[in-house]
Amino acid sequence: MSLTSRSLLATMISLALYGPAMANENNKLSEDVNDELALTSDNADEIELVRGVCIAPQDRSTDPNNDPIKVTADHAEALDKTKVTYTGDVVVQQGNRTIAADQAYLRQPENIVVAEGNVYFHDGTIEVDSERLQSDLDTEDSEMDHAVYNLTCEPGRGEARRITKTHAQGTQFYRMKDGTYTTCPAEDNSWRFSATTLEREGDSPFANLYNARFEVLDVPVFYLPYLRVPVGKERLTGFLYPSVSYGSRDGFEFETPFYWNIAPNYDLTLTPKYMSNRGLQLNTDFRYLTEFGQGSLKGEYLASDKAADNNDSRWAFNYSHNGTYKSNWLFDVDYSKTSDFNYFTDIDSSIGNREDNNLLQTAEVSYREQYWDSTLRVRDFQPLTETGQGSQYRLMPQLEFNYYRPNLPYELDFSMASSISSFANDASNKPDATRVHLEPTLTLPFATPWWSLTSEAKLLYTYYNQDLKSYSRDGIEETVSRTIPTARIHSGLYLERDTSIWGQDYTQSLEPQIQYLYVQDKDQSGIYNPVNDDGGGYDSTRLQQDYYGLFSDKTYSSVDYVAPANQFTVGASTRYFDGNFKERFTLSLGQIFYIDKPTVDDEVESYSATALETEFNYADWLFFKSSMQYDASDKEVQIANGAIEYRENGVYIQPNYRYVSSSYLDKYVTNPNSVNDDGDQDGISQLGLSTGFPLNGGLSVRADYFHDLNVNKMVEGQVGLTYRSACWLIGLTYNKYASSSLGSSNTEYDNNVSLTFSLLGLQGAKPFGASSDTSNAMSYGNSFSLNN
């Protein structure tokens, strides 16, 4: 029989009032019911359609209480006005709610519905199989006995002697007596929580467990009188999973993070970390999100380092913020500081790395309008050197003003970049300076789908007021100004054709381009700069001339030295796109030809090094990327790097290599602080290998290895073994890295072993291969761009 009405209560009452009269009139109720059921679908099929389906509250278009009711059964009987009984494959459906049972009846006037025998209940977020269900139609309170439940919108299942669902002030509460909870799949009891009482309020991400036991393979591991566990995907207050490791530097390590979800837009993570060789450290990470942007405050404090001289306290902190206000104002802050220069060498940190030479301390505020913007910036560094002095200049402050005016008469675009900067350094042998820079630019762009031509003229005016202190050099001046005109003409073509390779159709593009650049040669010896002064320049370093850098209009990152130019740059790129217009191969080649030939190290150069870049993606499982700069004059490769990777079915292997010649470092790396004592004076030649692959039965392994070929020593290596089941994960990692100079005869290494464990479903686990299990700086990285 199929009945439809606006409420289950109305349906039951109508049967209670009129059912007896119907039965007395013709005594054919059972027969009529069976006849009508012949027009409906099989009840078992209806249950299978909803079993395991998630219908989240936000996905429901209407209030289920206002939806019509559909009741199907083999037989319905109303003996009097106090009880109506349904028997045989009873199914009651209302919106997202479904109840199925062998038998169901209504008791009046209490408005109590009772379902018995193979009871199934589904309300969109939870499904329950039980022996008996009792529900109050007035309050929607329910009880289910000897129940097995499954959460349909999030991981979680279990069983209970009784499940009670109650309502109070619009909120529903679930309570389980003698219940269990796990995120493992059915028939898998790798782990579970058991408790005499489990409680959950509505859609709360927590479950409260009383007299709780944690069991592994049905064996109790620990007992707690009260435990609160996360059962949803929301950010949750509570202890996160601990980590255990052992290293030759810090000894035994144990840390237990505690996460505090203060508010929807504030949270705090407190991590006590015990190191047997050093002591107890407290790490904090506070994050916030406001109308002015987002930021974080990180702190690390070790009260008494047993491995340090005099048991000194050691610390580090970082504050970062970026955001906007009313769409015009932009804010950016990044400030870090530490107690001593060896902090990141001695202690693993989320604030800095052991390779860092400086800690950045910067803040800026910007205001933007349609045609102009302005930025006030301050920047400092904490040198991580024994003397506390470094080569970097403080910017205290810098004021930038930029003006843009496109679409002037004759299709011209105009812009004006300007700045006033104050540079300071504590070293007595380095000058300080105030610099004023103006850079008006006129641009005439022209473009079609296949051709472009851009002409540009600039005037670079710079004024310096330099405090030389004890620094001296012939020609350097305290006050100096410089005006340099520049001109640039850049043109490019875009051509394409259909082609076929090995029976596969492709679209090939050919993109040649040519540029003429003129920068007037001016005497700049009066300025402290990277050409006339070894390691000089306030904020200028030489840019790397890769393929795209060849077409830049400047050689240095800033204006302390403006390299003269009278030159042509010629280059071309070709790309191959498959039938889905997915880029599969690219090759770029370019070179600069000098009209006015520059002199470098007393050698006249007629052309620059040839820059080559290529990338290849074959069938989304084999990737290759490489770049090279080849100097034909010296017949040597200046810079080269490359990586090839096989990635398929959870397996990846990536050999990679990077190289910088010693002559390139001698010529162009003029900042002595950028060349460390790890053998870089002999150039850089480093080989790396990263790999990861699954083994049998949920086991997987990953490894990284990096080797310096110049000194024939390992830089860093690690290997990790991970076991992942459907509901838990455990990983063991060994890491070894050089903790002293590779150039020394007796390089020291630190060794670390770490163990991680995670219950999947209670807390998200990072995918295998996404990041390193240790704090090593060198690990697997996906540098390929043709994998879109």
UniProtKB/Swiss-Prot annotation:
Signal peptide segment: 1-23
GO CC annotations on file: cell outer membrane; transporter complex
Transmembrane segments: none
Keyword Nucleotide-binding: no
Keywords: Cell outer membrane, Membrane, Signal
GO terms of biological process kind: Gram-negative-bacterium-type cell outer membrane assembly; lipopolysaccharide transport
Compartment list: Cell outer membrane
Highest rank taxon of the organism: Bacteria
PANTHER family: LPS-ASSEMBLY PROTEIN, LPS-ASSEMBLY PROTEIN LPTD
NCBIfam families: PRK03761.1 (NF002997)
Family: Belongs to the LptD family.
Its job: Together with LptE, is involved in the assembly of lipopolysaccharide (LPS) at the surface of the outer membrane.
Subunit (UniProt): Component of the lipopolysaccharide transport and assembly complex. Interacts with LptE and LptA.
Official protein name in the record: LPS-assembly protein LptD
